[in-house]
Amino acid sequence: MQKLTIFVIFLCCWLVLTMADDYVKKCQHHCDLQLKRCARECHFPFHPYHKECLKICEKTKLHCFRWCAHA
């Protein structure tokens, strides 16, 4: 009985960690898509602050990744 309980607890923990890892990967993929969209807007015909715009996109991506890690 005790072995069964330990196995069930292990199985539950494994499922939670697997689902959490999958969620983080999906979240990070969303961040990458946001970065690409943002970068496209920075390249919009002769954006006056092109380099600053790209820096903002990169900072936004890092913030997004941090949010994914803590969610």
UniProtKB/Swiss-Prot annotation:
Q: Where does the UniProt annotation locate this protein?
A: Secreted
- GO CC, one annotated term: extracellular region
Write out the tissue specificity statement of the associated record: Nacreous layer of shell (at protein level). Expressed primarily in the mantle with highest level in the mantle pallium and lower level in the mantle edge.
Kindly indicate whether the keyword Signal belongs to this entry. yes
**What are the boundaries of the signal sequence?**
1-20
Top-level taxon in the UniProt lineage: Eukaryota
Q: Which controlled-vocabulary keywords does the entry list?
A: Secreted, Signal
Q: What is its main location?
A: secreted
Q: What is this protein called?
A: Uncharacterized shell protein 9
